[in-house]
Amino acid sequence: MTGRRQNSIGDRVLMALVFLFLYAPIIILIVFSFNAGTSSSVWKGFSLKWYESLLSNRLIMNSVYTTLMVSLLSTIAAAIAGTFAAIGLYAMSRRRRTIVNSVNNIPMMNADIVTGVSLCLLFVVFFNGWGAFAGWVNSWQSAVVLPERLTMGFGTLLIAHVCFNIPYVILSVGPKLRQMDRNLIDAAQDLGCTWMQAFWRVVIPEIKPGIVSGALTAFTMSVDDFIISYFTAGTSASTLAMTIYGMTKKRVSPEINAISTLLFVTVLVLLAIINLRDSHAARREHHAAAAAASGAPMKHHRRPNKVLRRVAAGVMACVLTALLVVTGRSVQSERVVNVCSWGEYIDEELITQFEEETGIRVNYQTAESNEALYSLIKMGGADFDVIVPSDYMLARLIQEDMLAELDYSHIPNFQLIDDTYKNLSYDPENKYTVPYAWGTLGIIYNTTMVSGPITSWDAMFDPQYAGQVLMINNSRDALAAALLDLGYSINTTDESQLEEAFALLKNAKDSGVYQAFVMDEVFQKMEGGNAAIAMYYAGDYLTMLENNEDLAFVIPEEGSNWFVDAMCVLKDTQHMAEAEEWINFIASTSSNLANMDYIWYASPNREALEQYPAYYQEVNEEELDPEIFQIMAPPAETLDRCEIYENLPKETLKLYDRLWTRLGV
């Protein structure tokens, strides 16, 4: 008996540990959604401000609206198409049905990235073919002018979702059709029903559970999808999953915790309603069986499951209506500009202000990296007007004739840009770009975890800090640290110097110096005191400093990289006037002041840079620490020790790729 009791206790403990492992991340997420601070690892007190901020976040609300519209429309279309397809399969011979069902299962088993890329390529090929066809038609007639340029957007996103949802409906409806007695249809027709009447009154009621199940699966898959949406949404549409992904480029925003909590609670409530309904149904069946066994007359109880269904339907309808009202906006606009930049790299109030002042709608999306942005544009999977790449990528885009020349008479605020940031190597004649922000790359370290102030890149390769160093997960920056430590230029094309830098980096990795190669993860690790040293950007250090005052930043004595991110317009834009109007607005002094206070990166606008300390004091009601301002905007003598990345020759870029692959990150 004692052994059984011990086994029972052990089973319960094991089950408790399993559930704790499963739900601990969700519990932490919910707790930190009420954190007054911005960190996901440092508690700053209880607050509801992130839920309030969530409702006023236009990017999230617009993406919720898009997600709901795409999911609902694709579910309806997939449910109709999938149901008729399943009925068609039902009429086939067993052998043919088996073959077609196997083909139907391929999209569900196929990797999402394969589906996403293939659909993207299909749309690109079709649009290119359409452009040639429309141009030919327009060349010999003018009665009906066909648009020669089609781009990906809400339409392609909807088509993609319908395509991958249909197989789930077929999979759910098919078994219900096979369970149905074929004689029911014949009997209905013998009693005078037409085929259509038999279809609606006999077939549909029989397969209704399968249709509902397939539709729910389709809706769930559509809401949850990221990869396929990423490749087919273009620039004018962004789902919630895409927006959340974009928001994590810099850190896990507390707003993400808030919306994730709301999603979890919504699912939990729906599951509770479903379980209560099933519980009531089981109780009724039990009472019916007991009454039948005893021969007693059955009592007619009120059907609580029907009431619950009505309540659940009413609640869902109210929630859906509220979301559509809150998030809804007109998707039609005479003027629009499509912008792509980095995550958390703009004060969102500026977007709202620009739209109100100009009437131009802004489609704002984010990219993961310069390389990812380049690939997306090159593949034809994006229709951006304004992009904000870094210096070396700007040089590459200009070299490949992918940018449009700007008419600076339409951008008068360009005169406010300091001469320091004009005529740089990536755009020596100032034809294509307007600087957006600039900053430096350096070393962030925890003063309580190192032996003394860090002054050299040696610290990134020092065995005494084994397991406590975070190396940036970027081949150009990581190799730059090694090149600088060896006394070489970060723009060297000498293969022997790059091999030497690689050897230094590889030796440090193999000897356990690096805890990890990171990008966004650096925030949580450095703020939480989980690492001593990291290579990262000055502006992001200032963000981390708000949550961990033990952190310090240094530009090593050997020098570093100072970078400029600039606004430019793609050559094939259809909204040149709107793009230049957006660039001029962002280049203004007021916009630069607001942006500096939000992103902690220095402005190239000389007036904004001079006025920022006073602006900071006015907005935050405290003086700006001169040391912080010097980190944000280093003086000329510091920048003289730094270099701007140049666009390297193709052979050198290929060497970088080979070395990074050999490093095995």
Segments and roles (model prediction):
Residues 3-8, 51-59, 223-280:
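Interhelical loop and adjacent transmembrane-helix boundary motif
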Residues 329-397, 524:
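Early extracytoplasmic/lumenal segment of secretory-pathway proteins
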Residues 4-13, 93, 174-185, 189, ...:
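C-terminal transmembrane helix and the adjacent membrane-cytosol boundary/short C-terminal tail
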Residues 191-192, 205, 437, 441:
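Glycine/proline-centered hinge or cleavage motifs at structural transition points of membrane proteins
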Residues 1-8, 73-104, 117-125, 199, ...:
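Transmembrane-helix boundary motif in ABC transporter permease subunits
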Residues 39, 48, 113-162, 196, ...:
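Membrane-interfacial helix termini and adjacent extracytoplasmic/periplasmic loops
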Residues 14, 19-26, 110, 163-174, ...:
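Transmembrane alpha-helices
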Residues 3, 24-58, 230-235, 283:
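Short membrane-interfacial helix/loop motifs at transmembrane-helix boundaries
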